């Protein structure tokens, strides 16, 4: 007699405390992605200490970000905020000459009601450099939402940024489009523009674009682009598609304010997710996919050595970076058992396609659909972990050491944020991260770890 497996997703919401990095940490990868930018954080010394300790960049390295520390005079309104920011931005222009300055507002600027949005337009007209204001403060649910805030603010500039650059440089076309290389000519279908949004390393973005190019789908641009002057043109009739699950605010901005058309698709994490991502995009342009099934099979074949290590193992997601649904779906497809998916925040509309793929994957693998807990209570989670005893807990850094001290295998979820995990070619990196603590403990057991400890 076979047990019936539920085919419905179960959502729960707790009101417990959750621990994550501050969203201003998004500067650590965005300043490297947007090469002609400069990030100016407006906050207290605490924000400065956090950035210095988190990024670990020395002063003499001259990174393209800085901290505007608020003093008592700023908080008590004894100083002129506009003049202080103007002085800093003029110095930034003189030293670095960026094409855009991005102000990152923090919790303190919210509390003292600093009008950054009101000062930015006046100041940018004075110094001749675009200034974008993003409120990436600690009031968000997860640190990855800092990128979401920055991209949503940057989306408003996509239509006007080329005109601004022409006026500033006095030239019609400062950056001409790259020429097609010989032997790489591809006949694209006559379809509307497609822009992808989400920050990825340049080499990963250059892997995803060719995957669509093989299907005769042309990517007109990325948000963010490698240079601010290369932002895509957005507007009515332009299709957009996200590559990360924590960009719901950007998606809403593109649809509501820029009148773009959002393609709801799973996210390109793992071979199954990448194939589903492409299969959602192509029909929108009346293009039939070719060779995707063979491409996915080829990748799964190359992952057999890792899959043999994780098959039958159990994993518990405590929730930290909003990548949990996509990672859980991929690991279930690899044969793992997911007890629980904790997630700091869930936008069911934006992640609808990913949730549907999670359900279909569980049905295909004949495993129960894990329950999804939004804003999990960490104390309740620890109790459930003690009861379930999973082989691996993917958790934030705050809980990793306490769990390790109790004999639990852990993996920092922040590592998945910075690792290259998107696309067919990088599926191996996900399993490398997941299996590392498992392989490490197996090697210690072979050395007689118990005897050594005693």
Curated annotation (Swiss-Prot):
An example Gene Ontology biological process: light-independent chlorophyll biosynthetic process
Region forming the signal peptide: none
GO MF term set: 4 iron, 4 sulfur cluster binding; ATP binding; metal ion binding; oxidoreductase activity, acting on iron-sulfur proteins as donors; oxidoreductase activity, acting on the CH-CH group of donors, iron-sulfur protein as acceptor
Subcellular location as annotated: Plastid, Chloroplast
Gene Ontology CC terms, in alphabetical order: chloroplast
Primary location: plastid
Superkingdom of the source species: Eukaryota
Residue sites binding [4Fe-4S] cluster per the record: 22, 47, 107
Annotated pathway: Porphyrin-containing compound metabolism; chlorophyll biosynthesis (light-independent)
Covalent S-S links between cysteines: none
Reaction equations catalysed: chlorophyllide a + oxidized 2[4Fe-4S]-[ferredoxin] + 2 ADP + 2 phosphate = protochlorophyllide a + reduced 2[4Fe-4S]-[ferredoxin] + 2 ATP + 2 H2O
Co-factor note (free text): Binds 1 [4Fe-4S] cluster per heterodimer. The cluster is bound at the heterodimer interface by residues from both subunits.
Pfam family, any one: Oxidored_nitro
Keywords, ordered alphabetically: 4Fe-4S, ATP-binding, Chlorophyll biosynthesis, Chloroplast, Iron, Iron-sulfur, Metal-binding, Nucleotide-binding, Oxidoreductase, Photosynthesis, Plastid
Enzyme Commission number, as recorded: 1.3.7.7
PANTHER family reported in the protein's UniProt record: LIGHT-INDEPENDENT PROTOCHLOROPHYLLIDE REDUCTASE SUBUNIT N (PTHR39429:SF3)
Subunit comment: Protochlorophyllide reductase is composed of three subunits; ChlL, ChlN and ChlB. Forms a heterotetramer of two ChlB and two ChlN subunits.
HAMAP family per record: ChlN_BchN
Functional description taken from the UniProt entry: Component of the dark-operative protochlorophyllide reductase (DPOR) that uses Mg-ATP and reduced ferredoxin to reduce ring D of protochlorophyllide (Pchlide) to form chlorophyllide a (Chlide). This reaction is light-independent. The NB-protein (ChlN-ChlB) is the catalytic component of the complex.
Family of this protein: Belongs to the BchN/ChlN family.
Xref: NCBIfam families: DPOR_bchN, PRK02842.1
Protein's name in the database: Light-independent protochlorophyllide reductase subunit N
């Amino acid at each position: 007699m076979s047990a019936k497996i539920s085919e419905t997703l179960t959502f729960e919401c707790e009101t417990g405390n959750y621990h994550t990095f501050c969203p201003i940490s998004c500067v650590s990868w965005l300043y490297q992605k947007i090469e002609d930018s400069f990030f100016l954080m407006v906050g207290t010394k605490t924000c400065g200490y956090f950035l210095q300790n988190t990024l670990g960049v020395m002063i003499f390295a001259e990174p393209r970000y800085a901290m505007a520390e608020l003093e008592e005079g700023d908080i008590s309104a004894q100083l002129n905020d506009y003049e202080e920011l103007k002085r800093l931005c003029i110095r930034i222009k003189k030293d670095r000459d960026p094409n855009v300055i991005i102000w990152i507002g923090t919790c303190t600027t919210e509390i003292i009601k600093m009008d950054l949005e009101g000062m930015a337009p006046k100041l940018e007209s004075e110094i001749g450099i675009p200034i974008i204001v993003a409120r990436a403060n600690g009031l968000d649910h997860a640190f990855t939402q800092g990128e979401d805030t920055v991209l949503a603010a940057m989306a408003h500039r996509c239509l006007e940024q080329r005109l601004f650059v022409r006026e500033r440089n006095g030239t019609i076309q400062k950056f001409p489009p790259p020429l097609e290389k010989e032997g790489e000519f591809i006949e694209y279908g006559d379809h509307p523009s497609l822009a992808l949004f989400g920050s990825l390393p340049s080499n990963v973005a250059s892997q995803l674009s060719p995957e669509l190019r093989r299907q005769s789908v042309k990517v007109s641009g990325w948000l963010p682009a490698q240079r601010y002057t290369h932002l895509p043109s957005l507007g009515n009739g332009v299709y957009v598609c996200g590559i990360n699950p924590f960009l719901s605010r950007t998606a809403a901005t593109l649809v509501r304010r820029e009148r773009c058309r959002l393609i709801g698709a799973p996210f390109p994490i793992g071979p199954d997710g990448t194939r589903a991502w492409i299969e959602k995009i192509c029909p929108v342009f009346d293009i039939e996919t070719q060779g995707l099934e063979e491409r996915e099979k080829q990748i799964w074949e190359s992952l057999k050595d890792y899959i043999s290590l994780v098959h039958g193992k159990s994993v518990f997601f405590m929730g930290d970076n909003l990548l949990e649904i996509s990672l859980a779906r991929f690991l279930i497809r690899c044969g793992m058992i997911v007890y629980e998916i904790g997630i700091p925040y869930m936008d069911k509309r934006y992640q609808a396609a990913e949730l549907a793929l999670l359900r279909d994957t569980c049905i295909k693998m004949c495993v129960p659909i894990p329950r999804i807990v939004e804003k999990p209570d960490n104390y309740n989670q620890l109790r459930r972990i003690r009861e379930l005893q999973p082989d691996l807990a993917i958790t934030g850094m705050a809980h990793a050491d306490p769990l390790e001290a109790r004999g639990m295998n852990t993996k920092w979820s922040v590592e998945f944020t910075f690792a290259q995990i998107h696309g067919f070619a990088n599926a191996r990196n996900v399993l490398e991260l997941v299996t590392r603590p498992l392989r490490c403990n197996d090697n210690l057991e072979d050395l007689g770890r118990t005897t050594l400890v005693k």
